[in-house]
Amino acid sequence: HIQVLDGKTAVTHVDIVDGDRVFGKYEEGVLADFKLREQDISFIKKHDLAVTGIWGMIEDELPLISKEIPVAFDFANKFANPIVEKAIPYVTYAFFSFDEESRNEFRQKYHSMGLKEKENCMEQLKEFMKAMQQKGPKVIIATLGKNGSIGYDGNSWYRFGIIECKVVDTMGAGDSFIAGFLYGILNGLNVQDSMEAGAQNSAVTIGYQGAW
C-alpha cells in the first residue's frame, strides 16, 4: 500500500566519519506536500501499531489514528521541533535520541519548558522525559548511543547498556533499536526486556555498511 507522487524522491545526504554517520543536506522532494488520504488512514488502522517519526508528515492525522491503534513516534534528536508538542499527546511509545550534536537544542527545549535546573545532563534528560511522559505516552525511551538507553513508564525507570559488537556503520542503529523494542512489546515482553531486544537488533545493524 503506497502513494506514488509526481516529483523527486526525498533524499538524505550522509557522510560516514570513523564509522559514525553524519547527516548533511536533506532534500524533501515530494514529502514537502505529502498528506495521508482517507484510504491510507483506514489501511493504517487495520494494523497492530502505527510507526512514524519527525519527518513522517502525518502528525495532523495522529488524533484519528491513535483512537484506533497505538502509535510509536521517533522524535530523533529534534527536541525543540514544534512537532514534538503537537504529536506527543497522541503517542503511545515515544523515542528520542540524546547525542552530542543535539545538546544545545535539548537545553533550549528544557529551559523553554521551565523545568528545574539539574546538576548534569542525565538528570535533566530524566526530568524532560518525566514531563513528556505526563503529556500522553505510555512509555518514553531515550537512546544514548554507546551508553545504551533509558526508559520511563510513569512509575519506573529502566536502563539497558549496549551489546558489544564490531561497529562498521552506525546508520540505522536507532531505527533498529526502535524496531526491536516494538517487536518485544508486541510479543508481550516488558519494557526492560524490550529495550534489550532493541539493543540486540541495533548490534546486528551496525555491523553492516550502509545498513539504513
Model feature map: region roles:
Residues 26-28, 96-98, 162:
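Active-site donor-binding loop signature of nucleotide-sugar glycosyltransferases
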Residues 107-212:
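Conserved phosphate-binding/catalytic region of the ribokinase-like
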Residues 1-48:
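Conserved N-terminal subdomain of the carbohydrate kinase-like
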Residues 42-45, 89, 135:
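Structured loop/turn residues at beta-strand edges in well-structured enzyme cores
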Residues 40, 84, 167:
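Acidic, amphipathic alpha-helical patches
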Residues 11-12, 20-23, 49, 70-71, ...:
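Structural motif
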Residues 49-127, 146-149:
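Conserved beta-alpha-beta core of the PfkB/ribokinase-like small-molecule kinase fold
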